Curated annotation (Swiss-Prot):
SUPFAM superfamilies according to UniProt: P-loop containing nucleoside triphosphate hydrolases
Organism: Chlamydia muridarum (strain MoPn / Nigg)
Disulfide linkage: none
Pfam families according to UniProt: AAA_31
Amino acids binding ATP: F13, K14, G15, G16, T17, G18, K19, T20
Coiled coil: none
Top-level taxon of the source organism: Bacteria
GO MF annotation, one: ATP binding
Protein known as: Virulence plasmid ParA family protein pGP5-D
Record-stated family: Belongs to the ParA family.
Record InterPro entries: AAA_dom, DNA_Partitioning_ATPase, P-loop_NTPase
UniProt entry keywords in alphabetical sequence: ATP-binding, Nucleotide-binding, Plasmid
Length: 268
């Protein structure tokens, strides 16, 4: 039997781009509205994705990074969440140590092997939330991922990181044309006079990769995280709930078209 797990890596070059918020909400929406079995993996040492679903690791409980370094059973650290159809591998308090190890000779294929061998039969979509940097943890995620979603905000320093992500992908042998699913823009203000300038800069680097749906600035996003739930469950009529649901459908449609294209190429 052929399984069709699709691994999405949410990434950014700097913090404050809405990366973790999108990882959480898109994952929950895929399960709730599209019936997908979703695994979230928190690779960010800040552990915000884990906290946002009430799944923070406490005490001496092992996390992803310790298990990978020790070559232990990764499935033992998958946790259920209160969201139907959504499981999570929480971040670990030893994330910083793993980040150091992973740049000094630790093989960068463990996560990919884990996804292929164990997760493929159990999940339809895996979403990996990466650190806002291009270190060892991000490299591990990029190698393991099928598609990348680059998270940006319409500000100069956020946009400047695009070229670095492109160079990073090339350095690990993953051309951006094949591996970037799209660019997601958050904290969007339709009234801003600089919108087109930022759009033009992004298009000059990643042509035709910007998602049609922009996530508008909305306080309900941070408020929903405090309640450890998705924004559409807590504030269903908010513009953030509408925007992220639309983005979820856009992502799903692209994944389906990419999967059909890949399958047809394999059968030629």
């Amino acid at each position: 039997m052929e399984y069709t797990l699709q691994t999405l890596v949410f990434c950014s070059f700097k913090g404050g781009t809405g990366k973790t918020t999108l990882s959480l909400n898109v994952g929950c929406n895929l399960a709730q509205f599209l019936g997908k079995r979703v695994l979230l993996i928190d690779l960010d040492p800040q552990s915000n994705l884990s906290s946002g679903l009430g799944a923070s690791i406490e005490g001496n409980h092992k996390g992803l990074h310790e298990v990978m370094c020790a070559s232990n059973d990764l499935k033992s650290i998958i946790c259920k969440t209160k969201k139907t159809g959504v499981d999570i591998i929480p971040a670990s308090f030893l994330s910083e140590q793993f980040r150091e190890f992973s740049t000094n000779g630790i093989p960068s294929s463990n996560l990919r092997l884990f996804l292929d061998e164990y997760c493929s039969p159990l999940y339809d979509v895996c979403i990996v939330d990466t650190p806002p940097s291009l270190g060892g943890l991000t490299k591990e995620a990029f190698i393991a991922g099928d598609k990348l979603i680059v998270c940006l905000i319409p500000e100069p320093f956020s946009i400047l990181g695009l070229q670095k992500i492109r160079e990073f992908l090339i350095s690990i042998g993953k051309p951006e044309e094949e591996h970037i699913l799209g660019v997601a823009l958050s904290f969007w203000d339709d009234r801003s006079s600089t919108n087109q300038t930022y759009i033009d800069i992004i298009e000059s680097i990643y042509e035709n990769k910007i998602f049609s749906t922009k996530i508008r600035r909305d306080i309900s996003l941070s408020r929903s995280l405090l309640k450890e739930d998705s924004v559409i469950n807590v504030y269903p009529t908010s513009r953030a709930a509408t925007d992220i649901l639309n983005l979820t459908h856009e992502i799903s449609a692209l994944l389906n078209s990419k999967h059909k294209q890949d399958f047809s190429q394999r059968t030629l």
